[in-house]
């Protein structure tokens, strides 16, 4: 079998790729692996899910796997991914399990594991779990009987604990702010409106009626058209959109203009520096963040550290360097002082808190970043490595970088999952960016044509 765990856990088509049998096997392997690491007590697991219909099926399989291996389970029901991480820490659990495919379409689902404290599961533990599943050794372990079988407890007030935690982190009350929140018919449907109201905001919730089938369906952080319209119609100061598991946050201004993760990071970085909480005056972002963010942060005296694409790499850099803020252009924002993973509702609260504290509209705050025009071309290739590394391609990239200088940049990277090479160019004008990107893309096509 191929690699089971990707950068965001196990993902696949529910009941096709990600079957109940696989969910059970992963859960059994996780429970046994943790028990072997610490035999002083039976493992304790927190299990949550988003609103996908398949979540109920997978939850049953995972809970059965955990308890059959002797682990006790706290079942928290439908909650955001960061809430499951938070409750894993609160319960002093050995592992957290979130059943979600985040922003993916409804037919997909996933299994994301958290370690004690709600942190990312260490790679070595993940590899042991994967090896056990792949070798099919999960059926060979001795099964506990009698009192050794794990028990299940349903936590009914987990959402309340989480909301109180979030609201307690906010520097300024949100009284007087009217916000439209798009809950993506997902895990934020109850929690996000509750948190924003508890903090003082007037809330209009849309796409907050999940039925198991409508999660991320033309709504949420990847589809903001309805949010833009609702903000204008309701005369709100801003709109906030989350994805299916509420680990992302993007916003729109009172006029309906989108504010992406780069701009949100810049707003929060300036607020935190002003409060003296931006460690080393440093922000962590990925290489996909717009050059406009780097230019803005340099102008403001804030250092920008770049990582590979993926919020896991942002998290790793934040923890390794003891930094206080990082994220992605897509809206994954991480504030380690308050959360162990990207938290969309937390981000929304702090974004509105900055508006309340300064009295400035979102559009004015977001203007600190002037994104450069960006062109992205996905080039189909026969071989991703050849397409990205051929001498003629590298020469064209070098020529482009010399032309653009400090006024633009080129990012060339093979896709991790598809036979594509992604060519991204930022420049002073869209015309220049497109011309440069097309030149490079043509060299990529020539170097590795599709057979």
Curated annotation (Swiss-Prot):
Keywords: Isomerase, Magnesium, Metal-binding, Phosphoprotein. Belongs to the phosphohexose mutase family. Binds 1 Mg(2+) ion per subunit. Its EC number is 5.4.2.10. One of its GO terms (cellular component) is cytosol. Pfam families: PGM_PMM_I, PGM_PMM_II, PGM_PMM_III, PGM_PMM_IV. It comes from Salinispora tropica (strain ATCC BAA-916 / DSM 44818 / JCM 13857 / NBRC 105044 / CNB-440). One of its GO terms (biological process) is peptidoglycan biosynthetic process. PANTHER family: PHOSPHOGLUCOMUTASE (ALPHA-D-GLUCOSE-1,6-BISPHOSPHATE-DEPENDENT) (PTHR42946:SF1), PHOSPHOHEXOSE MUTASE (PTHR42946). The modification Phosphoserine is found at residue 102. Gene3D superfamilies: Alpha-D-Glucose-1,6-Bisphosphate, subunit A, domain 3 (3.40.120.10), Alpha-D-phosphohexomutase, C-terminal domain (3.30.310.50). The active site is at residue 102. This is Phosphoglucosamine mutase. The keyword Iron does not apply. Activated by phosphorylation. It catalyses: alpha-D-glucosamine 1-phosphate = D-glucosamine 6-phosphate. It comes from the Bacteria. Catalyzes the conversion of glucosamine-6-phosphate to glucosamine-1-phosphate.
């Amino acid at each position: 079998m191929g690699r089971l765990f990707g950068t965001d856990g196990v993902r696949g088509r529910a009941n096709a790729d990600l079957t109940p049998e696989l969910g059970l096997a992963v859960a059994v392997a996780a429970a046994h692996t943790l028990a072997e690491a610490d035999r002083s007590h039976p493992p304790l697991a927190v299990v949550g899910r988003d609103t996908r219909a398949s979540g109920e099926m997978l939850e049953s399989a995972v809970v059965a796997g955990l308890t059959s291996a002797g682990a006790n389970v706290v079942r928290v029901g439908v909650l955001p991914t960061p809430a499951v991480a938070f409750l894993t820490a609160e319960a002093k659990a050995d592992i957290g399990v979130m059943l979600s495919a985040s922003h993916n379409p409804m037919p997909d689902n996933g299994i994301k594991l958290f370690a004690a404290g709600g942190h990312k599961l260490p790679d070595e533990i993940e590899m042991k779990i994967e090896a056990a599943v792949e070798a099919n050794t999960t059926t060979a372990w001795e099964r506990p009987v009698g009192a050794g079988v794990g028990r299940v407890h349903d936590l009914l007030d987990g959402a309340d604990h989480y909301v109180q935690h979030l609201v307690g982190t906010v520097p300024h009350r949100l009284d007087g702010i009217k916000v439209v929140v798009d809950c993506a018919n997902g895990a934020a449907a109850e929690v996000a409106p509750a948190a924003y109201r508890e903090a003082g905001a007037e809330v209009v919730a849309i796409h907050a009626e999940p039925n198991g089938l409508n999660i991320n369906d033309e709504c949420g952080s990847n589809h903001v058209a309805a949010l833009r319209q609702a903000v204008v119609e309701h005369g709100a100061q801003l709109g906030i959109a989350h994805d299916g598991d509420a680990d992302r946050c993007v916003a729109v201004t009172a006029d309906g203009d989108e504010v992406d993760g780069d701009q949100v990071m810049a707003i929060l970085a300036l607020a935190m520096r002003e409060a003296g909480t931006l460690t080393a005056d440093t922000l962590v972002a990925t290489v996909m963040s717009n050059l406009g963010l780097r230019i803005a942060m340099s102008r403001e005296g804030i250092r920008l550290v770049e990582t590979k694409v993926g919020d896991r790499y942002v998290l790793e850099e934040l923890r390794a360097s003891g930094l206080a803020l990082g994220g992605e252009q897509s809206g994954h924002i991480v504030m380690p002082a308050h959360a162990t993973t990207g938290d969309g509702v937390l981000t929304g609260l702090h974004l509105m808190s900055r508006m309340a504290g300064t009295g400035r509209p979102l559009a004015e705050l977001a203007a600190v970043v002037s994104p450069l025009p960006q062109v992205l071309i996905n080039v189909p290739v026969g071989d991703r490595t050849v397409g990205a590394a051929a001498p003629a391609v590298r020469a064209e990239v070098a020529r482009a970088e010399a032309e653009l200088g400090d006024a633009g940049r080129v990012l060339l990277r093979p896709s991790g999952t598809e036979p594509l090479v992604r060519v991204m160019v930022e420049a002073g004008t869209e015309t220049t960016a497109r011309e440069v990107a097309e030149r490079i893309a043509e060299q990529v096509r020539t170097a590795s044509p599709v057979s």
